[in-house]
Amino acid sequence: MKLCGFEVGLDKPFFLIAGPCVIESEQMALDTAGELKAITGELGIPFIYKSSFDKANRSSGKSFRGLGMEKGLEILATVKREIGVPVLTDIHEIDEIKPVAAVVDVLQTPAFLCRQTDFIRACAQSGKPVNIKKGQFLAPHDMKNVIDKARDAARDAGLPDDVFMACERGVSFGYNNLVSDMRSLAIMRETGAPVVFDATHSVQLPGGQGTSSGGQREFVPVLSRAAVATGIAGLFMETHPDPNKAMSDGPNAVPLSRMKELLAVLRDLDALTKRAGFLEDNFGWPACA
């Protein structure tokens, strides 16, 4: 699959989707995107900038949601133009798709909406690549149905059907907790779509602070190493210059100052993993046949 001018897949270096959870200001967006571009450029990692204009599923109705679609898209367009990087943002309603697709390079669907057929079909018919997040309630093999819906919709519209990604972001484990089953990354390869691992939402503690979600950012390096060692096409990671002051998802965001050292480790591990190959491709039962 070709994405934003670069090839993605298990035979290619992983690409990175990264940025603050929500757009807080134009200057912060420009500064963060510029820093990430410099880091990924030095490390040779393909990069897509991510930030949201609206967080429609906050734990509390009193929490900051964002700057709104009009202002948010203006800022994303500025980042794209001035920093020279492709941009991604998420949409939450069918009516948002057309104006957002006119600005960004990649669309992203919220995990909660992965089973909404009309929504997935509309996103697939936007003409843009779509990063489709797996719901916290969904088995990994069920993502094949979701990807198939998107492909069918694209073909119905006469559009390419190989522009969709399947993204793992953890699965609910009791109340206010998520776990990451690394088997899901291998299982989701059966969709035929590039698999992306969301390393920061996977350490989220949904609603864990009562009116907001908590998180355990100290486990981002742990899970991201595990995912890269399993084998992924892409890595999603939210970052912030000062996570403790972030207006959304600070507890699970990676400090921007730590991104370079983490990505350097992951780049080297990714190269080793892909050079060694994937034994699981022909490791099924019976093992001694």
UniProtKB/Swiss-Prot annotation:
Catalytic activity: D-arabinose 5-phosphate + phosphoenolpyruvate + H2O = 3-deoxy-alpha-D-manno-2-octulosonate-8-phosphate + phosphate
Enzyme Commission numbers on file: 2.5.1.55
GO CC terms of this entry: cytoplasm
Protein location: Cytoplasm
GO annotation terms (biological process): keto-3-deoxy-D-manno-octulosonic acid biosynthetic process
Top EC class of this enzyme: transferase
Pathway as given in its UniProt record: Carbohydrate biosynthesis; 3-deoxy-D-manno-octulosonate biosynthesis; 3-deoxy-D-manno-octulosonate from D-ribulose 5-phosphate: step 2/3; Bacterial outer membrane biogenesis; lipopolysaccharide biosynthesis
Family annotation (InterPro entries): Aldolase_TIM (IPR013785), DAHP1/KDSA (IPR006218), KDO8P_synthase (IPR006269)
Keywords assigned by UniProt, alphabetized: Cytoplasm, Lipopolysaccharide biosynthesis, Transferase
Family designation: Belongs to the KdsA family.
Record gene name: kdsA
Organism superkingdom: Bacteria
GO MF annotation, one: 3-deoxy-8-phosphooctulonate synthase activity
Protein name: 2-dehydro-3-deoxyphosphooctonate aldolase
Organism: Cupriavidus pinatubonensis (strain JMP 134 / LMG 1197) (Cupriavidus necator (strain JMP 134))
